[in-house]
Amino acid sequence: ITFLTRAEQASPRDGAIKAALGSAMVHMETPTRALDYFGEAQLLGAPERLFLADRGLARDLLGQQDAAQRDYQLALSIAPNDETVRRYALSLAISGEPDRAVQFLTPQLKAQDRAAWRLRAMILAINGRNDEATQIVNATMPPALAQNIIPYLTQLDRLNPAQQAAAAHFG
């Protein structure tokens, strides 16, 4: 972040630097500040493709699932990648669409992608399907880790949407 701050001081009207700062802020769990930077980046002419997926994450962290999903859809139409698919699937699950979320994950699940399987368990837990989530965790994780994560998973459906996004993305 120090490097980016210096870059911003040297080139305060560089949209790409603002976009990078926005991405850094979202990963530092400061989504409101991230959205400010993304807005500045856009005003300065930075291409949205530089930050769509991270802006979607910032919006998810603020409980703005509809806006987040629009960002993810656009990001996926420009440059599909597994991480953005997982973010989009989680956002759908938070919005109460667990089956649609799992449908998006299906190619990764068939490829035995561990991140996708963990996310599938979270999707189910967010939607109150704790027995199914527990089965997945027990089948895909070492026993000690599974036992540590199950109590956490079974609380996900009690959180608000912003908290669910934060819990899933940052633990």
Could you describe each region identified by the protein language model?
Residues A10, H27-M28, L44, L61-L62, ...:
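Register position in tetratricopeptide repeats
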Residues L76-P80, P98, P107-A116, M122-N148:
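TPR/TPR-like (Sel1-like) alpha-helical repeat modules
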